[in-house]
């Protein structure tokens, strides 16, 4: 499968390496034309306000709202998939959730935590991580919690997580999970 990684800001190279590790082809997405011929898209972590502005400037907001494409959002990607954050910023609004940005505090409060997603254990890296504040419809499934906070959700062809699987040695397991749960079932 060809897995696109939005290449305007964030942990792009790390996601590419994980996609290669599970024997799929990563494709860096820099323009809306690059969205052709991919089977799924990853929106990486980064700074969600900056990413949202760049996505709007380059036409990604409208293009992705109209695309029939499975999407994984990690950290800032989770924020961008949400309906709202309590702050004015461009969002895709594809998932029926609202977000608490930087719920765990500043970068100095980054941490790792063992999470289990449907029997898959991974060491999750949280950096200035968001959490789901509200679930707005029954279509949203909780797939991960950390300390009582919702840090992973799935809705149809969209999956959003607060952590960085690309920074964990066994993070490739999460990409396999995404491809099996969302992309292959689409």
From Swiss-Prot:
Lyase listed as a keyword: yes
Molecular function, one GO term: pyridoxal 5'-phosphate synthase (glutamine hydrolysing) activity
PROSITE patterns registered for this protein in UniProt: PDXT_SNO_1, PDXT_SNO_2
Top-level taxon of origin: Archaea
Keyword Lyase in record: yes
Catalytic activity: aldehydo-D-ribose 5-phosphate + D-glyceraldehyde 3-phosphate + L-glutamine = pyridoxal 5'-phosphate + L-glutamate + phosphate + 3 H2O + H(+); L-glutamine + H2O = L-glutamate + NH4(+)
Binding site for L-glutamine: 46-48, 101, 127-128
Extent of the signal sequence: none
Assigned keywords, A-Z: Glutamine amidotransferase, Hydrolase, Lyase, Pyridoxal phosphate
Biological process per Gene Ontology, one example term: glutamine catabolic process
Active site: 75 (nucleophile), 164 (charge relay system), 166 (charge relay system)
UniProt pathway annotation: Cofactor biosynthesis; pyridoxal 5'-phosphate biosynthesis
E.C. number(s) listed in UniProt: 4.3.3.6, 3.5.1.2
Assigned protein family: Belongs to the glutaminase PdxT/SNO family.
Function field: Catalyzes the hydrolysis of glutamine to glutamate and ammonia as part of the biosynthesis of pyridoxal 5'-phosphate. The resulting ammonia molecule is channeled to the active site of PdxS.
HAMAP family referenced in this protein's UniProt entry, alphabetically: PdxT
Record note on quaternary structure: In the presence of PdxS, forms a dodecamer of heterodimers. Only shows activity in the heterodimer.
Protein's recorded name: Pyridoxal 5'-phosphate synthase subunit PdxT
Gene this protein is translated from: pdxT
């Amino acid at each position: 499968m060809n897995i696109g990684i939005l290449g305007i800001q964030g942990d792009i190279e790390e996601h590419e390496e994980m996609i290669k590790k599970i024997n799929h082809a990563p494709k860096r997405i820099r323009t809306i034309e690059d969205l052709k011929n991919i089977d799924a898209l990853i929106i990486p972590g980064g700074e969600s306000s900056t990413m949202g502005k760049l996505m709007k400037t380059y036409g990604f907001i409208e293009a992705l709202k109209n695309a029939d494409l499975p999407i994984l959002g990690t950290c800032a990607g989770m924020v961008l998939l949400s309906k709202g954050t309590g702050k004015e910023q461009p969002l895709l609004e594809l998932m029926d959730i609202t977000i608490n940005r930087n719920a765990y505090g500043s970068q100095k409060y980054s941490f790792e935590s063992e999470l289990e997603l449907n029997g898959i254990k991974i060491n999750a890296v949280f950096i200035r991580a968001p959490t789901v504040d509200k679930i707005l419809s029954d279509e949203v499934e909780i797939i991960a919690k950390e300390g009582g906070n919702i840090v992973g959700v799935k809705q149809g062809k969209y999956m959003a997580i607060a952590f960085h699987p690309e920074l964990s040695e066994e993070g490739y397991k999460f990409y396999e999970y995404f491809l099996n749960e969302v992309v292959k079932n689409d």
